[in-house]
Amino acid sequence: PFLRLNQSRLNREMLSGATEEQYGIIGRHRLAEMEDMDAYIEIRGGGNAFELSSVPQENMAAAMKALNPVSQRRIRHTRWCGLRWPSGGMAQQASMSTEEFEDFYFRTCLMDYAALRPAMRKLAAMMEKAEYVKITGPGTDISFSIKGLPAIPCAGECNLPDGEVFTAPVIDSANGHISFNTPSLFQGIPFDNIRLTLKNGLVVHAEAGDKTGELNTILDTDPGARRLGEFAFGVNPAITRPMRNILFDEKISGSFHLTPGQAYHVADNGNQSRIHWDMVCIQTKAAGGGDIYLDGKLVRRNGLFTLPELAILNPSLS
């Protein structure tokens, strides 16, 4: 095995001081290393989730440009698994005690994913048969096509915790506006109440309160950053509220996410970007509610699937 240890404070110093040329060298070396790997396990942890918040955006862009080929090689050509270490910092982000968070972490990671898999496959089959998606809710009225694109159920094979069924919008099909009610942490910067307006698949307006400037800078990373690369249902019944950690939040039962940036190769709509930013909206009644339709048929209302065969994917009441 090959072991690589990274520290967030050292990463910040590298990101703040390295030139684009130096990051190109780092990227080439890491790509060569990844090309020699059969499998990859990533365990992330740390005390300060905001460590990278002061790194200039142009430095982050240079790093993403250099390291994106490494990520794509890992995703496409290795057996991989990503998870987090349940640290005190993560508990603090989630507004939980360390003990409470540890219990929650192991409960969500070690749940019986096999029991969810049949319903997730049924949902994926419904998505693959559908042509159009329409989503409505507070501040949200958006529609797009998913015609001809695969739908992938994720039930504990790669990420832990897991629990989503994803596809991708046809690249030029999304029209409408959407409001994301779940806090988002991206590149070390906290964002709240992100709002996007899309026309023919392109984000033409984006705002996030006092972080609107930072939001638009990230969306200007490259042309693909203003187009959607993923649409997914969150279906882990044990995750019912935000943790400010996307590995958990994108799986929240009763949620969906739309993703500006790179599409996954297994559900490839052709969008390419150096970013992949999952933005989450919770549609439970407590969060404001909302509906999702496939080809005009209501499949989820206020975070609850309407079909009995999908009920196991609804938020846990325990």
Region locations from a protein language model:
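Short solvent-exposed loop/turn micro-motifs enriched in small/polar/acidic residues
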Residues: M126-E128, I171, Q187-P190, G224, ...
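Long, well-ordered mid-to-C-terminal structural blocks that present hydrophobic/aromatic surfaces
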Residues: I171-T217
